[in-house]
C-alpha cells in the first residue's frame, strides 16, 4: 500500500509539471504581440526620469493594424495599360547631324526620326533657306531646339513634301527638287518617320538652313527643327614667276583660287630661302566669285634681272577654314631673265624693214601705219636667223611703203605677260607716183564714173517706160 501511494503521488506531480509546461508554451505568443505597444512613447514606463533640457516631442500614435489588413484585403488588381496615342517625348524630332560640314561637291546624308512613325496620315516637309540672304530665319537659329506648332518661315524653297498632292501650287521648289526635276539634286529615302535627306552634290547653292516640318496631315506643322548644312572648299595654289627683261625687277605671283569660306587666306613670301618682310614689296588682293573666293598675291624683288642669277620664290599659303581648323601649302618657282632686244627700222626702195635681235622663239612683228590702231592690212614678209643665245633668234620683217601714210610702227608681239611694249617708230615720205601710173589711175577712175552714169541713165529710162506702159493699160481698162 505504501508503495502504491508513493507511485500515485509521483504520477500526480508529473502530470502537474506537464500542465505547467503546456501553459507556458501557449502563453509565449501572446507576450510577443504586446512588445510593439510597450515600446511606444505613449506607453513608456512612468518610472523613467525625463531630462528637462531635452526638447519635448509630440508622440505619434501607432497606426491600427485593422486598417492595414482591411486595405490589403480590399485591394483590386491593377487594370491593363491603355492603348491610346503614345506620349510625346521631350525631343520629338531627332536628327543625327544638326550642323554638318562637308567638302564641295560631296554627297551629304542627314537622318532624322519623328514620333508616331507608323501613322500613315503623317506628313513631312523640308524647306531650304540661303544662309546669307534670308533674314526671316534669324542669324543663328537654335539647331537642336524642337519647335512646336511653328510653320516654315517665308522666303524658303521647298525641297521635299511627302504629300505632293497637297502641296500649295504657288510654292517655290528648290532647283533640282519637285515633280519632274532633272537632274535631281535632292532625294528622301527610308521608312516613314525615319527618312534620310540626300543632297547629291553639295555646292554654294545647295548649302544653307534646312527646316524639317513634321505632323499629321491635318496639322503638318506640329514639330519643326533646323539643320544647317555648310560647305568648305580648299584653295588650289599656283605660282607664276614672271619673265623679266634685263634691268627689270624680279616678280612672282601666287594665286589661291576657288576656296570657300573666305575667312582668311594669308601669304608669306620667301626669296631664295629668306622671308620677305617689307610690306611695300607685297601686294595682295581678294575677290569674291560665284564659285568661291580667290586671292592673288604678288611680290616684287629689290634685285633686277641681268645683275645676278635668277631668283627662286616660294609662297606659303595658310587658309583658315574656320576659327579652329586651317591648312598650309607651299609653291615655288624660279623667275627667268630675257635679253632686252635691239629694234631697228630702215627704208629700202619701196619697202620698210624692221629688225629685232635676240628675241624669244615665237615672237613676231606687227606693223601699224599712222594713227590707225589696227595692224596694217598688207602682208609683211618675215625671216628669222640664229642669235647665238639658246632659245632666242633675230627676226626681220618687211612691209611695202604706203603712198598715204608717213608714220610707221613695228611692234614685237608674243612676249610673256608683264613685259612692256617693245616697238620702234619711223617716218618716211611717200615716193612720187609714176606719171603713167597716175594717168592709168585717172583713166580707170574716169571709166568708172562713166559706167556709173550710164547705168543710172538706163535705170531711169527703164522706170519711165514702165510707168508709161502702166498708165496706158489703166486708161484702157477705164474706157
UniProtKB/Swiss-Prot annotation:
<feature type="glycosylation site" description="N-linked (GlcNAc...) asparagine; by host">
    <location>
        <position position="40"/>
    </location>
</feature>
<keyword id="KW-1133">Transmembrane helix</keyword>
<keyword id="KW-1161">Viral attachment to host cell</keyword>
<dbReference type="InterPro" id="IPR036179">
    <property type="entry name" value="Ig-like_dom_sf"/>
</dbReference>
<dbReference type="InterPro" id="IPR001038">
    <property type="entry name" value="GA_GC"/>
</dbReference>
<dbReference type="GO" id="GO:0046718">
    <property type="term" value="P:symbiont entry into host cell"/>
</dbReference>
<comment type="similarity">
    <text>Belongs to the herpesviridae glycoprotein C family.</text>
</comment>
<dbReference type="InterPro" id="IPR007110">
    <property type="entry name" value="Ig-like_dom"/>
</dbReference>
<comment type="function">
    <text>Major attachment protein that mediates binding of the virus to cell surface heparan sulfate or chondroitin sulfate. Also plays a role in host immune evasion by inhibiting the host complement cascade activation.</text>
</comment>
<keyword id="KW-0732">Signal</keyword>
<keyword id="KW-1233">Viral attachment to host adhesion receptor</keyword>
<feature type="disulfide bond">
    <location>
        <begin position="254"/>
        <end position="315"/>
    </location>
</feature>
<dbReference type="InterPro" id="IPR013783">
    <property type="entry name" value="Ig-like_fold"/>
</dbReference>
<feature type="region of interest" description="Disordered">
    <location>
        <begin position="30"/>
        <end position="100"/>
    </location>
</feature>
<keyword id="KW-0472">Membrane</keyword>
<keyword id="KW-0899">Viral immunoevasion</keyword>
<feature type="glycosylation site" description="N-linked (GlcNAc...) asparagine; by host">
    <location>
        <position position="116"/>
    </location>
</feature>
<keyword id="KW-0812">Transmembrane</keyword>
<comment type="subunit">
    <text>Interacts with host complement component C3b; this interaction inhibits host immune response by disregulating complement cascade.</text>
</comment>
<feature type="topological domain" description="Virion surface">
    <location>
        <begin position="28"/>
        <end position="446"/>
    </location>
</feature>
<dbReference type="GO" id="GO:0042784">
    <property type="term" value="P:symbiont-mediated suppression of host complement activation"/>
</dbReference>
<keyword id="KW-0325">Glycoprotein</keyword>
<dbReference type="GO" id="GO:0016020">
    <property type="term" value="C:membrane"/>
</dbReference>
<feature type="disulfide bond">
    <location>
        <begin position="95"/>
        <end position="112"/>
    </location>
</feature>
<dbReference type="GO" id="GO:0055036">
    <property type="term" value="C:virion membrane"/>
</dbReference>
<dbReference type="GO" id="GO:0098671">
    <property type="term" value="P:adhesion receptor-mediated virion attachment to host cell"/>
</dbReference>
<keyword id="KW-1015">Disulfide bond</keyword>
<feature type="signal peptide">
    <location>
        <begin position="1"/>
        <end position="27"/>
    </location>
</feature>
<feature type="disulfide bond">
    <location>
        <begin position="354"/>
        <end position="410"/>
    </location>
</feature>
<keyword id="KW-1160">Virus entry into host cell</keyword>
<feature type="domain" description="Ig-like">
    <location>
        <begin position="235"/>
        <end position="327"/>
    </location>
</feature>
<keyword id="KW-0393">Immunoglobulin domain</keyword>
<feature type="transmembrane region" description="Helical">
    <location>
        <begin position="447"/>
        <end position="467"/>
    </location>
</feature>
<feature type="glycosylation site" description="N-linked (GlcNAc...) asparagine; by host">
    <location>
        <position position="165"/>
    </location>
</feature>
<dbReference type="Pfam" id="PF02124">
    <property type="entry name" value="Marek_A"/>
</dbReference>
<keyword id="KW-1087">Inhibition of host complement factors by virus</keyword>
<feature type="glycosylation site" description="N-linked (GlcNAc...) asparagine; by host">
    <location>
        <position position="51"/>
    </location>
</feature>
<feature type="glycosylation site" description="N-linked (GlcNAc...) asparagine; by host">
    <location>
        <position position="149"/>
    </location>
</feature>
<feature type="glycosylation site" description="N-linked (GlcNAc...) asparagine; by host">
    <location>
        <position position="330"/>
    </location>
</feature>
<feature type="disulfide bond">
    <location>
        <begin position="358"/>
        <end position="387"/>
    </location>
</feature>
<keyword id="KW-0946">Virion</keyword>
<feature type="region of interest" description="Heparin-binding domain">
    <location>
        <begin position="105"/>
        <end position="119"/>
    </location>
</feature>
Amino acid at each position: 500500500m505504501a508503495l502504491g501511494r508513493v507511485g500515485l503521488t509521483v504520477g500526480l506531480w508529473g502530470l502537474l509539471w506537464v500542465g505547467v509546461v503546456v501553459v507556458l508554451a501557449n502563453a509565449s505568443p501572446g507576450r510577443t504581440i504586446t512588445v510593439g505597444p510597450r515600446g511606444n512613447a505613449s506607453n513608456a514606463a512612468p518610472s523613467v526620469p525625463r531630462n528637462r533640457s531635452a526638447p519635448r516631442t509630440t508622440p505619434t500614435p501607432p497606426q491600427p493594424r485593422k486598417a492595414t489588413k482591411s486595405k490589403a484585403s480590399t485591394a483590386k488588381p491593377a487594370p491593363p495599360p491603355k492603348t491610346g496615342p503614345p506620349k510625346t517625348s521631350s525631343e520629338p524630332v531627332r536628327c543625327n547631324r544638326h550642323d554638318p560640314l562637308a567638302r564641295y561637291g560631296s554627297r551629304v546624308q542627314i537622318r532624322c526620326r519623328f514620333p508616331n512613325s507608323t501613322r500613315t496620315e503623317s506628313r513631312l516637309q523640308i524647306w531650304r533657306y540661303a544662309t546669307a540672304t534670308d533674314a526671316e530665319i534669324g542669324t543663328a537659329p537654335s539647331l537642336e531646339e524642337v519647335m512646336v506648332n511653328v510653320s516654315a518661315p517665308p522666303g524658303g524653297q521647298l525641297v521635299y513634301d511627302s504629300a505632293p498632292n497637297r502641296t500649295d501650287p504657288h510654292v517655290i521648289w528648290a532647283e533640282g527638287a519637285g515633280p519632274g526635276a532633272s537632274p535631281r539634286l535632292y532625294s528622301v529615302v527610308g521608312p516613314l518617320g525615319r527618312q534620310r535627306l540626300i543632297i547629291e552634290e553639295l555646292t554654294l547653292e545647295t548649302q544653307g538652313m534646312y527646316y524639317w516640318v513634321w505632323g499629321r496631315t491635318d496639322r503638318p506643322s506640329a514639330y519643326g527643327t533646323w539643320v544647317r548644312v555648310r560647305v568648305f572648299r580648299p584653295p588650289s595654289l599656283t605660282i607664276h614667276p614672271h619673265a623679266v627683261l634685263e634691268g627689270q625687277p624680279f616678280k612672282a605671283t601666287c594665286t589661291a583660287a576657288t576656296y570657300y569660306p573666305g575667312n582668311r587666306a594669308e601669304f608669306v613670301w620667301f626669296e631664295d630661302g629668306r622671308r620677305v618682310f617689307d610690306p611695300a614689296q607685297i601686294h595682295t588682293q581678294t575677290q569674291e566669285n560665284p564659285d568661291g573666293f580667290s586671292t592673288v598675291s604678288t611680290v616684287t624683288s629689290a634685285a633686277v634681272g641681268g645683275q645676278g642669277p635668277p631668283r627662286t620664290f616660294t609662297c606659303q599659303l595658310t587658309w583658315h577654314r574656320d576659327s579652329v581648323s586651317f591648312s598650309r601649302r607651299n609653291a615655288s618657282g624660279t623667275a627667268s631673265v630675257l635679253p632686252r632686244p635691239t629694234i631697228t627700222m630702215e627704208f629700202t626702195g619701196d619697202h620698210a624693214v624692221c629688225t629685232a635681235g635676240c628675241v624669244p622663239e615665237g615672237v613676231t612683228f606687227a606693223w601699224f601705219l599712222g594713227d590707225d590702231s589696227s595692224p596694217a592690212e598688207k602682208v609683211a614678209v618675215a625671216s628669222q636667223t640664229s642669235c647665238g643665245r639658246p632659245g632666242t633668234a633675230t627676226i626681220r620683217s618687211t612691209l611695202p611703203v604706203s603712198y598715204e601714210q608717213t608714220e610707221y610702227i613695228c611692234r614685237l608681239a608674243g612676249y610673256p605677260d608683264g613685259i612692256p611694249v617693245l616697238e620702234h617708230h619711223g617716218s618716211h615720205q611717200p615716193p612720187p607716183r609714176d606719171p603713167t601710173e597716175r594717168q592709168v589711175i585717172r583713166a580707170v577712175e574716169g571709166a568708172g564714173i562713166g559706167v556709173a552714169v550710164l547705168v543710172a541713165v538706163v535705170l531711169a529710162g527703164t522706170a519711165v517706160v514702165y510707168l508709161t506702159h502702166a498708165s496706158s493699160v489703166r486708161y484702157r481698162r477705164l474706157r
